[in-house]
From Swiss-Prot:
Top-level taxonomy: Eukaryota, Metazoa, Chordata, Craniata, Vertebrata
GO cellular component, one term: nucleus
Domain of life: Eukaryota
Known role: Acts as a transcriptional regulator. Together with NKX2-2, initiates transcriptional activation of NEUROD1. Involved in neurogenesis. Also required for the specification of a common precursor of the 4 pancreatic endocrine cell types.
Predominant subcellular localization, coarse grouping: nucleus
Subcellular location: Nucleus
Record key words, sorted: Activator, Developmental protein, Differentiation, DNA-binding, Neurogenesis, Nucleus, Transcription, Transcription regulation
Pfam families per record: HLH
UniProt protein name: Neurogenin-3
Length: 214
């Protein structure tokens, strides 16, 4: 049976006569025609084995890049740790230097026996504490001995404002007359009961030894 003549005919459709999808606007048709093919599309002639090789190669490149960046980050962290440690060591060194300078200045004012005695830090602090306490007690005892309670005056010597002359009474209790006798020598002559200690007994030479302050 001979083929139908219509089957042998081929219909050629030009791009101008090709109809778009039903319901699509001219703008959508133009955008679809002008859109370039996606780069992620795999060519048809590329086999699956080649695609696997390409993916494996990209993974290896990423791993190499990550391996190169990782040592850099670790190196930066180690440098940062060393910098912090160095700053902390510098602060501690300065603190100890200031402490040693202060202790040396304190040793310079303490009466050590012998003079070239080298005290440790704790010995210096203990000696300074005890030395300050001894000086405080010395001043307290000296003040108590010098400004002690006045001796009682006999009743027969007490006068009254009405008895005797007003000049004697005013000369005794007048602030002006007392202001002129403020020297320690005059006070001792008027009140023989007051005695000024020459020096405390525990400050005499040989009374205290250097070990008493430690």
């Amino acid at each position: 049976m001979a083929p139908h003549p219509l089957d042998a005919l081929t219909i050629q459709v030009s791009p101008e006569t090709q109809q778009p999808f039903p319901g699509a606007s001219d703008h959508e048709v133009l955008s679809s025609n002008s859109t370039p093919p996606s780069p992620t599309l795999i060519p048809r002639d590329c086999s699956e084995a080649e695609v696997g090789d390409c993916r494996g190669t990209s993974r290896k490149l990423r791993a190499r890049r990550g391996g190169r960046n990782r040592p850099k980050s670790e190196l930066a962290l180690s440098k940062q740790r060393r910098s912090r440690r160095k700053k902390a060591n510098d602060r501690e060194r300065n603190r100890m230097h200031n402490l040693n300078s202060a202790l040396d200045a304190l040793r310079g004012v303490l009466p050590t026996f012998p003079d070239d005695a080298k005290l440790t830090k704790i010995e210096t602090l203990r000696f300074a504490h005890n030395y300050i306490w001894a000086l405080t007690q010395t001043l307290r005892i000296a003040d108590h001995s010098f400004y002690g309670p006045e001796p009682p005056v006999p009743c027969g010597e007490l006068g009254s404002p009405g008895g005797g002359s007003n000049g004697d009474w005013g000369s005794i209790y007048s602030p002006v007359s007392q202001a002129g006798n403020l020297s320690p020598t005059a006070s001792l002559e008027e009140f023989p009961g007051l005695q000024v200690p020459s020096s405390p007994s525990y400050l005499l030479p040989g009374a205290l030894v250097f070990s008493d302050f430690l």
